[in-house]
């Protein structure tokens, strides 16, 4: 049930009937304050200006023509021409009843699209670090949200599994196997990479072999391909441990590494030349883009093939977009990559559009994000200035959550305690990130993220347990709530209306890729439930009808909190 869309449609019809053009916008918004109703239509001012009318006069005409019978109990004009809409409580009660029993909380089924989501993208033979966290969890929240709405979502883990460094890595893996050291299983990928680099820099014979292996690997040599595959498999097995701990939906089946596009690169360069988009320049192949100028005001050159024949990231990204449209059948392609890559992506996509590889009807969207900073406002590092490994960060999160939870639950069974600690620790790290606007940098702060009050995972998880505890205490389930829902109190109405806005919120999150909007909604919902719980007797209500009505509101609150948190990849617990 999308109330905003319903009201927008009704107000637009009234505006058109009042003489507005067919493309006019009703500008219906959720009201910020209860005194202005539940929704506000703000489109009258812009339309009145076009029609040369007084806004108030047009607003009066629109209200006369606006048919909200059975939906609104009152419509008011405020100020110069704002239209305030107060929803009818009987109508709200009926919609809550529907949401309670309907699939997906009554969210309207969408016309399914095939949507490719590019996220996470770790590198082979390197451990995942905190720099991979934002792409991984924000991207996964998008995947979960789009899948919930009914879209066919293709997860694309654009793993860095190709490049000149693989000659060095294959040579070093071979050296270890010859020394019977392969049982280390690359347990410390970071150390493996560092030692390979050190050997490459210090041993000329090793470096020659490494360079030869690059050529062999790129020409399809079977031995080199086997060694390369082993490196990829070991890395992704370790990354899977991180994904599972993070409650992220990525698996090995979602890996679409850079190597996937290798065979396409020569064809793309040849095609861009044939189309007159790419030219030779000092031995390299370059596409000059009028849309981007260098410091001298000349079209910027984007190299797609170096003079030694090697390809660049841009070439791979062009191939990647082409593949996602032509082979995967994408209707929409989302990239969760940090903001520093924006110009690079825009240049690649400009070439993609000019070449006709992806039509304009298929959006290419860079859902960029800022950096994760320490309390000092600088990039988040270890005390010694090194990169923080993701596994170390998650270990610390669980350890800190353990102290917090064990202290408050000395009698909880060990298995349940472990599960709660894990859900709270991992949830705290994820929610702290997801609750901030992704476009900004954010400060990583343990104390804030593990706080039991404020917009944090522990608070939200506790809010959920508080709601479900009502049903434990009452000993009732949904099937026993047979009386019709009635709304008699303002706090009931406020909670019920907010519950019905779930579809508006999840639709916005799916469109914009903004999980912080869902976090804000859930936090607001938890606050409204808290106020309702404190001021409206539930189990000891004055009548059985009111008792059941309030239990139904509590039930839909629990379902909405759980579903909303699930779209963020945050686990709920029954007790805390």
UniProtKB/Swiss-Prot annotation:
User: Which GO molecular function terms does the record list?
Assistant: arginine-tRNA ligase activity; ATP binding
Q: Does the keyword Nucleotide-binding apply?
A: yes
> What positions carry the motif 'HIGH' region?
122-132
Q: Which SUPFAM superfamilies match?
A: Anticodon-binding domain of a subclass of class I aminoacyl-tRNA synthetases, Arginyl-tRNA synthetase (ArgRS), N-terminal 'additional' domain, Nucleotidylyl transferase
Listed InterPro entries: aa-tRNA-synth_I_CS (IPR001412), Arg-tRNA-ligase (IPR001278), Arg-tRNA-synth_N (IPR005148), Arg-tRNA-synth_N_sf (IPR036695), ArgRS_core (IPR035684), DALR_anticod-bd (IPR008909), Rossmann-like_a/b/a_fold (IPR014729), tRNAsynth_Ia_anticodon-bd (IPR009080)
GO CC, alphabetical: cytoplasm
Q: Name one GO biological process term.
A: arginyl-tRNA aminoacylation
Instruction: Indicate yes or no for the key word Cytoplasm.
Output: yes
PROSITE patterns hit by this protein: AA_TRNA_LIGASE_I (PS00178)
> Where does the source fall among the domains of life?
Bacteria
**Keywords from the named record:** Aminoacyl-tRNA synthetase, ATP-binding, Cytoplasm, Ligase, Nucleotide-binding, Protein biosynthesis
Q: What Gene3D superfamilies does UniProt report for this protein, alphabetically?
A: Arginyl tRNA synthetase N-terminal domain (3.30.1360.70), HUPs (3.40.50.620), Isoleucyl-tRNA Synthetase, Domain 1 (1.10.730.10)
Instruction: Please write the reaction equations for the catalytic activity of this protein.
Output: tRNA(Arg) + L-arginine + ATP = L-arginyl-tRNA(Arg) + AMP + diphosphate
Q: Could you tell me the EC number(s) of this protein?
A: 6.1.1.19
Cellular compartments annotated: Cytoplasm
Description of how the protein assembles with itself and partners: Monomer.
Family, per the entry?
A: Belongs to the class-I aminoacyl-tRNA synthetase family.
Q: Which PANTHER family match?
A: ARGININE--TRNA LIGASE, CYTOPLASMIC, ARGINYL-TRNA SYNTHETASE
What is this protein's record name? Arginine--tRNA ligase
Q: Which organism is it from?
A: Yersinia pseudotuberculosis serotype O:3 (strain YPIII)
Q: Which gene encodes it?
A: argS
């Amino acid at each position: 049930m999308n109330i905003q869309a319903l009201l927008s449609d009704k107000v637009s019809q009234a505006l058109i009937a009042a003489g507005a053009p067919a493309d006019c916008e009703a500008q219906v918004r959720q009201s910020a304050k209860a005194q202005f109703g539940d929704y506000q239509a703000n489109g009258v001012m812009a339309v009145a200006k076009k029609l040369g009318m007084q806004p108030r006069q047009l607003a009066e005409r629109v209200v006369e023509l606006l048919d909200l019978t059975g939906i609104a109990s009152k419509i008011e004009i405020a100020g110069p021409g704002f239209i305030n809409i107060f929803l009818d409580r009987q109508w709200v009660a009926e919609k809550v009843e529907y949401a309670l029993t309907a699939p997906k909380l009554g969210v309207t089924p969408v016309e399914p699209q095939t949507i490719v989501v590019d996220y996470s993208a770790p590198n082979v033979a390197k451990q995942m670090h905190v720099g991979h966290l934002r792409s991984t969890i924000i991207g996964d929240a998008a995947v979960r949200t789009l899948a919930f709405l009914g879209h066919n979502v293709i997860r694309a883990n654009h793993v860095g599994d190709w490049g000149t460094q693989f000659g060095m890595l294959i040579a070093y893996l071979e050296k270890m196997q010859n020394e019977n050291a392969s049982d280390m299983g690359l347990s410390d990928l970071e150390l493996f990479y560092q030692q390979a680099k050190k050997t490459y820099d210090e041993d000329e014979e090793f470096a020659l072999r490494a360079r030869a292996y690059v050529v062999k690997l790129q020409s399809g040599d079977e031995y080199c391909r086997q060694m390369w595959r082993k490196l990829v498999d070991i890395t992704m097995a370790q990354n899977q441990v991180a994904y599972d701990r993070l409650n992220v939906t990525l698996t090995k089946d979602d890996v679409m590494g850079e190597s996937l596009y290798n065979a396409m690169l020569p064809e793309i360069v040849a095609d861009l030349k044939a189309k007159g988009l790419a030219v030779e320049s000092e031995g390299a192949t370059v596409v000059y883009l009028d849309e981007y100028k260098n410091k001298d005001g000349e079209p910027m050159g984007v190299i797609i093939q170096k003079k030694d024949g090697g390809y660049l990231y841009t070439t791979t990204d062009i191939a990647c977009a082409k593949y996602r449209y032509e082979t995967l059948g994408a209707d929409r392609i989302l990239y969760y990559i940090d903001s520093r890559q924006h110009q690079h992506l825009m240049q690649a996509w400009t070439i993609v559009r000019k070449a006709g590889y992806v039509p304009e009807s298929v959006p290419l969207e860079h859902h960029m994000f800022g950096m994760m900073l320490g309390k000092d406002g600088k990039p988040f590092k270890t005390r010694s200035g090194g990169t923080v490994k993701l596994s170390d960060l998650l270990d610390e999160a669980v350890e800190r959550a353990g102290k917090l939870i064990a202290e408050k639950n000395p009698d909880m069974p060990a298995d349940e305690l472990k599960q709660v600690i894990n859900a709270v620790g991992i949830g705290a790290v994820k929610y702290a990130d997801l609750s901030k606007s992704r476009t900004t940098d954010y400060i990583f702060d343990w104390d804030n993220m593990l706080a039991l009050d404020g917009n944090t995972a522990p608070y939200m998880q506790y809010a959920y347990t508080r709601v479900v505890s009502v049903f434990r205490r009452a000993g009732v389930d949904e099937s026993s709530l047979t009386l019709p829902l009635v709304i008699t109190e303002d706090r009931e109405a406020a909670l019920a209306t907010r519950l019905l806005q779930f579809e508006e919120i999840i639709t916005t999150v799916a469109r914009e890729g903004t999980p912080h909007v869902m976090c804000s909604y859930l936090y607001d919902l938890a606050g409204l439930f808290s106020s309702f719980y404190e001021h409206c007797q539930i189990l000891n209500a004055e009548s059985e009808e009111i008792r059941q009505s309030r239990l139904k509101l509590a039930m839909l609150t629990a379902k909405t909190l759980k579903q909303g948190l699930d779209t963020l990849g945050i686990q709920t617990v029954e007790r805390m």
